[in-house]
């Protein structure tokens, strides 16, 4: 069945699919012929009959598009179609891209449109929605504790040919020097063995990855008791002078909601960090029980909340 589509609807559909290069402008009848000597309907008719033009128009997609927002001078927020959050931090000598997202585009090329500085990569943890494009960098920063997860990324995206030799291992207390801006590393293993957060005291930002908006039902998640102890170490670090009033910036904007759609807006924060420690303690003490959650990885998953904190877990990590 063929459905007739007017030009306005065609342009609207193309823009909804992510094509920012197609525009619709309506002029009074006869205006274009009088002013420019062209008949617009003839132009569109020709375009609709041009197979190459149609292929170009309808191959436009949001999957390879990125949106960027300047959070403050020197820090950009970048988002792909999958609600994956990336951040670009500028120093005097170079810039650091934190995570690569899952989009079909080229996050390195996009980052290079935002800064004139050389761009390096730091990965919060080795999940495909955070490091699909690590192969675009000659070397990158990541905890080598997550290397066993790299084959899972490459099973889904064989073009990712990153090797262990390309990984610059990062540990608790390390710092990545961008020139006048130091990005500090804090290990918060739980979601994965090598999960880290990055602290930028210059711009007052804490990049949390998936350390607080938390799935603990995934393969290789650590015991909840280990995760809690790592959170306590992070709490102690953030209690030191110079670590107050940091903006918590997560790996996905949906982390700012609850476990289920429609729950209240709850951004990552010092309060959520405190509540997550309490939630871990309640789970370990048997004082909190989750409800079945639809996304699992071969073992039943449960979702549980306490104040501003929420977690999806499996019973095998409840120890």
Enumerate the predicted regions with their spans:
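Core dinuclear metal-dependent hydrolase active-site scaffold
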Residues: 173-199
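Active-site-proximal loop/helix segments of hydrolase catalytic cores
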Residues: 189-226, 231-232
């Amino acid at each position: 069945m063929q459905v007739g589509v007017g030009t306005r609807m065609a342009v609207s559909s193309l823009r909804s699919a992510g094509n920012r290069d197609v525009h619709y402008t309506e002029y009074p009848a006869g205006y274009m012929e009088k002013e420019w000597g062209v008949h617009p309907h003839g132009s569109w008719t020709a375009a609709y009959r041009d197979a190459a033009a149609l292929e170009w128009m309808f191959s436009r997609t949001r999957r390879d598009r990125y949106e960027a927002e300047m959070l403050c001078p020197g820090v950009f927020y970048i988002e792909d179609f999958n609600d994956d959050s990336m951040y670009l931090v500028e120093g005097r000598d170079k810039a650091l891209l934190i995570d690569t997202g899952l989009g079909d585009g080229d996050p390195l090329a996009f980052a290079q449109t935002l800064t004139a500085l050389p761009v390096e990569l730091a990965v919060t943890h080795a999940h495909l929605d955070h490091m699909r494009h690590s192969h675009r960098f000659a070397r990158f920063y990541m905890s080598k504790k997550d290397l066993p997860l790299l084959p899972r990324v490459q099973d889904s995206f064989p073009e990712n040919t990153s090797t262990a030799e390309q990984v610059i291992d990062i540990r608790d207390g390390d710092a990545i020097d961008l020139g006048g801006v130091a990005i500090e590393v804090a290990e918060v293993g739980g979601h994965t063995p090598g999960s880290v957060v990055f602290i930028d005291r210059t711009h007052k930002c804490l990049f949390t990855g998936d350390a607080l908006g938390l799935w603990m039902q995934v393969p290789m998640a650590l015991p909840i008791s280990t995760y809690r102890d790592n959170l306590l170490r992070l709490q102690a670090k953030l209690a030191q002078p110079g670590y107050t009033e940091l903006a918590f910036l997560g790996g996905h904007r949906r982390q700012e909601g609850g476990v289920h759609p429609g729950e209240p807006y709850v951004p990552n924060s010092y309060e959520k960090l405190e509540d997550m420690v309490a939630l871990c303690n309640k789970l370990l003490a048997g004082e909190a029980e989750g409800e079945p959650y639809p996304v699992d990885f071969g073992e039943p998953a449960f979702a549980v909340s306490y104040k501003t904190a929420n977690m999806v877990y499996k019973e095998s990590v409840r120890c």
